[in-house]
């Protein structure tokens, strides 16, 4: 009996040590992503981060939120809606989710934690369809309402606290606004650029308590493309804050899923990459949206199914990886309200962009839950994303392709209005916890803070704070490896001791 008690006690001792070691090794928050040149890199491993994203807006088929645009579905209280979708996206091989708008007054801790556990990063839109919550289609300065800057501060504080926030977007396709001025999409650009400048200045003023998350914008893919890249990269009043840290185009150019099975056959994409190369944009460029649905491709009776060869090419073909960092497929689920007859059928429809749809037809995410049903093209995207060869490019060996800051195009105004006179919000010091680990836990340096309104010298090199922070992350990762090895050795010793005890008791 004594022998059994001793063995039982030893087993409990080993189990508790093993559990403690495993808990100590677990790290729910993924390393944050940093920029260098026109690439994204993992701040811990130093390896290039290639985007394999999906635009996410799970609009129900019915109910009071059926007609609501850009409702925030990823708050803690909607966990029953988004959590099953994260499992689907993880299966798909997705590492990035694009959100168009969020409610900064609500908690997103659960969503961001669950994304991080699955290795998923999040791009956050700062605008919303509410009054004065976005750049409006009006002449400057009216197109940039004061309330928008207040909202942006709220959104920044709500999401910069998470290590897996990939970036913030100050606008989506504002260059389609043509009701005022020249009717060529350039009229509201000074408002967008002023808004970008102000958000970046605010972010710089918060680096004493928050990571400086890359801030950029998404643009409709309309020519002349070089013009948009030049405008949002050029420096106004010698202030780095007036430049986007990344840009997303929304191109829908690869539309032949049957004839274009190899990259060399895609004239649309190759032509696009040539334009990007000639423009020499020095910072990360992505497909904010992609996924043309006009192809003649029927699978299991479902028409216009996408092959998604482009989803693989953009992260493997050198012509593409040299110019873009990846992209976001549009979109997770077909929005019934955008269909011609608002009916879910197998027929082609210009508004059918989902890789799946919700069932039943009257589901509302409430009384009647919505179940995601994949289209046949879902399997194509899964193949593309899960078989993509990982990049071997490292941050330490990469020196950038394009280094010059682009000049402002003469045909677009750079007369930017002053920063709105609104109350500046206090920078968040929150450290949300995921599986016992705090986010926003990097060592802050108050000396890096730039006072709101002050200028920053323009540069195409990663800023020193980001580089230093990345180095610290790499050291942390190395320490984690050493800890794991030490833990393994300790456990081996314990197991040997227990085995010896067993032999003594026999």
Functional labels for PLM-detected ranges:
Residues 67-89, 148-158, 224-238, 306-316:
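Short, acidic/polar
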Residues 290-296, 301-413, 419-420:
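Substrate-binding cleft of secreted/luminal carbohydrate-active enzymes
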Residues 152-186, 216-218:
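Active-site groove signature of glycoside hydrolases
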Residues 455-494:
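C-terminal GPI-anchoring signal of eukaryotic secretory precursors
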Residues 79-140, 188-218, 277:
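Aromatic-lined substrate-binding rim segments of carbohydrate-active enzymes
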Residues 184-314:
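Noncatalytic carbohydrate-binding groove/subsite architecture in carbohydrate-active enzymes
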Residues 12-31, 501-506:
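N-terminal signal peptide
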Residues 28-118, 153-157:
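Active-site-adjacent substrate/metal-binding segments within catalytic domains
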């Amino acid at each position: 009996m004594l022998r059994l008690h001793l063995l039982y006690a030893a087993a409990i001792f080993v189990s508790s040590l093993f559990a403690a070691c495993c808990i100590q090794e677990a790290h729910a928050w993924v390393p944050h992503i940093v920029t260098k040149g026109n690439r994204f890199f993992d701040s811990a491993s130093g390896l290039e981060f290639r985007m394999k994203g999906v635009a996410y807006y799970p609009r129900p088929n019915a109910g009071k939120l059926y007609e609501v645009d850009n409702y925030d579905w990823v708050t803690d209280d909607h966990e029953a809606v988004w959590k099953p979708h994260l499992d689907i996206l993880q299966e798909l091989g997705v590492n990035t989710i694009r959100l168009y708008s969020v409610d900064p007054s609500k908690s997103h801790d659960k969503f961001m934690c669950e994304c991080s556990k699955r290795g998923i990063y999040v791009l956050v839109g700062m605008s919303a369809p509410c009054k004065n919550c976005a750049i409006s289609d009006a002449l400057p300065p009216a197109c940039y309402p004061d309330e928008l800057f207040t909202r942006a501060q709220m959104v920044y504080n709500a999401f910069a606290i998470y290590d897996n926030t990939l970036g913030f977007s100050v606008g989506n396709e504002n260059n389609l606004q043509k009701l005022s001025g020249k009717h060529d999409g350039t009229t509201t650009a000074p408002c967008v650029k002023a808004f970008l400048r102000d958000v970046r200045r605010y972010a710089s003023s918060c680096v004493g308590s928050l990571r400086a998350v890359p801030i950029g914008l998404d643009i409709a893919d309309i020519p002349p493309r070089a013009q948009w890249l030049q405008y949002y990269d050029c420096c106004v009043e010698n202030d780095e804050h007036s430049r986007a840290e990344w840009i997303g185009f929304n191109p829908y150019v690869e539309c032949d899923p049957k004839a274009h099975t190899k990259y060399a056959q895609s004239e649309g994409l190759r032509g696009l990459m040539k334009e990007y190369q000639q423009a020499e944009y020095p910072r990360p460029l992505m497909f904010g949206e992609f996924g043309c649905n006009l192809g003649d491709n029927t699978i299991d009776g479902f028409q216009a199914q996408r092959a998604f060869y482009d989803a693989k090419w953009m992260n493997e073909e050198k012509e593409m990886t040299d110019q873009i960092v990846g992209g976001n497929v549009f979109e997770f689920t077909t929005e019934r309200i955008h269909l011609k007859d608002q009916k879910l059928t197998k027929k082609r429809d210009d508004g059918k962009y989902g890789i799946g749809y919700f069932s039943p037809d009257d589901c509302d995410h409430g009384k009647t839950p919505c179940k995601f049903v994949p289209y046949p093209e879902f399997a194509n995207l899964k193949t593309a994303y899960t078989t993509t060869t990982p990049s071997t490019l490292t941050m330490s060996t990469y020196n950038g392709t394009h280094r010059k800051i682009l000049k402002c195009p003469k045909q677009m105004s750079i007369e930017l209005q002053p920063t709105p006179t609104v109350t500046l919000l206090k920078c968040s010091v929150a450290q949300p916890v995921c599986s016992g680990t705090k986010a926003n836990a990097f060592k802050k340096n108050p000396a890096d803070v730039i006072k709101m309104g002050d200028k920053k010298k323009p540069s195409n090199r990663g800023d020193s704070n980001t580089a230093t922070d990345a180095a610290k992350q790499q050291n942390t990762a190395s320490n984690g490896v050493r800890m794991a090895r030490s833990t393994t050795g300790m456990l081996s010793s314990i197991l040997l001791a227990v085995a010896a005890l067993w032999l003594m008791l026999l």
